[in-house]
From Swiss-Prot:
Disulfide bonds: none annotated. InterPro entries: TR_Rrf2-type_CS (IPR030489), Tscrpt_reg_Rrf2 (IPR000944), WH-like_DNA-bd_sf (IPR036388), WH_DNA-bd_sf (IPR036390). This is Protein rrf2. Pfam families: Rrf2. Keywords: DNA-binding. Residues 2-132 form the HTH rrf2-type domain. GO terms for cellular component: cytosol. It comes from Nitratidesulfovibrio vulgaris (strain ATCC 29579 / DSM 644 / CCUG 34227 / NCIMB 8303 / VKM B-1760 / Hildenborough) (Desulfovibrio vulgaris).
Length: 150
């Protein structure tokens, strides 16, 4: 299954907020600069993540974004699920009967199971786990290029 940039960039943005926003809110411009993602695209992701309850915002000169929960309480799979517009790798599965061949389709059930397995595996990791992984990087090895795509 190929995840969209919404999942990859949204997870990176949450991780950035987790790593830099523990004491004060993080500005969207700072996130954009560190992650090499446009402010405009991050604004779209912020709306989704705020609605899902993962981040809070503070207005004003020193405003920005912070996690709404502790990093260890935010499972990566739940974040990806909130960011992706499609739950399964195909439009039809056993829970979404949209295909006219549904009654005779022999592969329908595996697509839903594949998605469930992916989210279950992703949920074995939290933002805190990813932060610990980042702390293992040698100094400067984890610096993100302005042209980073993953």
């Amino acid at each position: 299954m190929k995840l969209t940039t919404r999942s990859r960039y949204g997870t990176r943005m949450l991780l950035d907020i987790a790593m830099h926003g523990s004491e004060q809110p993080v500005s969207i411009k700072d996130i954009a600069q560190r992650q090499g993602i446009s402010v405009k695209y991050l604004e779209k992701l912020i709306r989704v993540l705020r609605k899902a309850g993962y981040i809070t915002s503070t207005l004003g000169a020193h405003g920005g974004y912070q996690l709404a929960h502790k990093a260890e309480d935010i499972p990566v799979g739940d974040v990806v699920y909130a960011l992706e517009e499609m739950e399964a790798p195909v439009e039809c599965d056993e829970e979404n009967p949209c295909c006219p061949r549904m009654a005779v389709c022999l592969t329908r059930t595996i697509w839903g199971e594949a998605a469930k397995a992916m989210y279950r595996k992703l949920n074995t990791f939290t933002l805190a786990d990813l932060m610990r992984d980042a702390s293992l990087c040698p100094k400067n090895a984890c610096n993100i290029s302005p042209h980073a795509t993953h």
